[in-house]
Amino acid sequence: MIGKQATLCDIVLEELVLPIDLHCHEELPELPEELEESVVEEEPEYTPYKIVVYCGGCDTKLKLYILATLSGIRDFQTSLLGPVKLLCPTCREEIRNGRR
């Protein structure tokens, strides 16, 4: 600008914010197979469960509170319905002291 007043020829209009293409053409480097598998594997989701079973010695009601995955709770259920019996503290002491 030359002089005291600006003329149209002296004013240069430019966009202040330049648009950037967000869909750039960059490529990510290839990850080794071991890293790809570890990235794909997610942390298993743990769900809280309340389990009510009866003592294997005196049939007292026992309550268990656990966190388990879906497959873990199914395996635990299979064990409880099969060869595993839980004991209350009283029966545990009796067996421990040789009374049973």
From Swiss-Prot:
Subcellular location: Host cytoplasm; Host nucleus
GO biological process: DNA-templated transcription; symbiont-mediated perturbation of host cell cycle G1/S transition checkpoint; symbiont-mediated suppression of host innate immune response; symbiont-mediated suppression of host type I interferon-mediated signaling pathway
Major site of localization recorded for this protein: host cell
Keyword vocabulary terms for this entry: Activator, DNA-binding, Early protein, G1/S host cell cycle checkpoint dysregulation by virus, Host cytoplasm, Host nucleus, Host-virus interaction, Inhibition of host innate immune response by virus, Inhibition of host interferon signaling pathway by virus, Interferon antiviral system evasion, Metal-binding, Modulation of host cell cycle by virus, Oncogene, Transcription, Transcription regulation, Viral immunoevasion, Zinc, Zinc-finger
Motif (LXCXE motif): 22-26
Start and end residues of each stretch annotated as E7 terminal domain: 1-43
Keyword Repressor: no
Function field: Plays a role in viral genome replication by driving entry of quiescent cells into the cell cycle. Stimulation of progression from G1 to S phase allows the virus to efficiently use the cellular DNA replicating machinery to achieve viral genome replication. E7 protein has both transforming and trans-activating activities. Induces the disassembly of the E2F1 transcription factor from RB1, with subsequent transcriptional activation of E2F1-regulated S-phase genes. Interferes with host histone deacetylation mediated by HDAC1 and HDAC2, leading to transcription activation.
Full protein name: Protein E7
Organism, as annotated: Human papillomavirus 22
